[in-house]
From Swiss-Prot:
Function of the molecule: Peptide chain release factor 1 directs the termination of translation in response to the peptide chain termination codons UAG and UAA.
UniProt-recorded name of the protein: Peptide chain release factor 1
GO MF assignments: translation release factor activity, codon specific
Keyword Ribonucleoprotein: no
InterPro entries, per the entry: PCRF, Pep_chain_release_fac_I, Pep_chain_release_fac_I_sf, Prokaryotic/Mito_RF, RF-1
Transmembrane segments annotated in the record for this chain: none
Naturally occurring in which organism (per UniProt): Bacillus subtilis (strain 168)
Domain of life (superkingdom): Bacteria
Family affiliation: Belongs to the prokaryotic/mitochondrial release factor family.
Length: 356
């Protein structure tokens, strides 16, 4: 571990030199690339230096015990050794976590897709609750939410809603939302007061850059049609809605949220690029999962990950056995407690795998 940390520190010093080089300063692409690389290893280098300093102080304190000391001084040195041992152990554990390979998608924006599944209209209404929850969470994080496509039902729910959340580290926190979300509550339309169970599925895709997914125009079929509102009625006589089909993979994306066909095509391309990138990622992950499986779940979108129980104001995350009696707050976007618990569990799992 120490050899690896030393080489990371050497790379950090080299990046300092490169970022002062006039040739790099005048090259925006290289400047951005090196700045990001340095930012990514900054915390690791800082903690390593703290660890090294504490280790040196610990060695010096232990050496002092070999000298002739009076009883009071000896007790002081022993106390210092005890504190420094705790500090080095804490820093060592932090370094182990920092050395876990980082998900290359963590810093990206995220495209989220929510679909009402089992439960008909009640599932569509629950999809709306989830969309609002994620929108509020994004707002609390200082992120921006933009709807890409929405299929609204007559009662104001969503058969499907696709939206992008833009902000630093958005994917790193929301990627754990992949899967089936279950709701237990009494529907407003239910006169008998019986609790119904419905589900909605959530997919989280990292936004893909053009350089990451090479899509050729010849591989895309573009269809245009008149956009429609709730219930299917036409709301636009112009052919502004766009459907893109990526012929090699069969991935299809529609967008009719904007009045302009050009803007709809731009939005659809973002979703198409993310879905194709995600398809490749899923295939690579499937190979990896044959040998190892994460403790916080496989990321399989059919996997039931969480239950929202309205009568008991309870949320349960089944992957880590977390139960919180704060459903009302969570639906208002206060997801930090859940997200942080999932991150900690994921890091612990990866650490165990790397040590195994």
């Amino acid at each position: 571990m120490l050899d690896r940390l030393k080489s990371i520190e050497e790379r950090y010093e080299k990046l300092n030199e490169l970022l002062s080089d006039p040739e790099v300063v005048n090259d925006p692409k290289k400047l951005r690339e090196y700045s990001k690389e340095q930012s990514d290893i900054q915390e690791t280098v800082d903690v390593y230096r703290q660890y090294r300093d504490a280790s040196e102080q610990l060695a010096d304190a232990k050496a002092m015990l070999e000298e002739k000391l009076d009883a009071e001084m000896r007790d002081m040195v022993k106390e210092e050794i005890s504190e420094l041992q705790k500090e080095t152990e804490t820093l060592s554990e932090r370094l182990k976590v920092l050395l876990i390979p980082k998900d290359p998608n963590d810093d990206k924006n995220v495209i989220m897709e929510i679909r009402g599944a089992a439960g008909g209209e009640e599932a569509a209404l629950f999809a709306g609750n989830l969309y609002r929850m994620y929108s509020r969470y994004a707002e609390l994080q200082g992120w921006k939410t933009e709807v890409m496509e929405a299929n609204v039902t007559g009662t104001g729910g969503y058969k499907e809603i696709i939206f992008m959340i833009t902000g630093s580290g958005a994917y790193s926190k929301l990627k754990y939302e992949n899967g089936a979300h279950r709701v237990q509550r009494v529907p407003e339309t239910e006169s008998g007061g019986r609790i119904h169970t419905s589900t909605a599925t959530v997919a989280c895709l990292p936004e893909a850059e053009e350089v990451e997914v090479d899509i050729h125009e010849k591989d895309i079929r573009v269809d245009t049609f008149a956009s429609s509102g709730p219930g299917g009625q036409s709301v636009n006589t112009t052919m502004s809605a766009v459907r893109l089909t990526h012929l090699p993979t069969g991935v299809v994306v529609s967008c009719q949220d904007e009045k302009s066909q050009i803007k709809n095509k731009e939005k659809a391309m973002k979703v198409l690029r993310a879905r194709i990138y995600d398809k490749f990622q899923q295939e690579a992950q499937a190979e990896y999962d044959q040998t190892r499986k994460s403790a916080v779940g496989s990321g399989d979108r059919s996997e039931r990950i969480r239950t929202y129980n309205f009568p008991q104001n309870r949320v349960t995350d089944h992957r880590i056995g977390l139960t919180i009696q704060k459903l009302d707050q969570i639906l208002e976007g206060k997801l930090d407690e859940v997200v942080e618990a999932l991150i900690v569990e994921d890091q612990a799992s990866k650490l165990q795998q790397s040590e195994g």
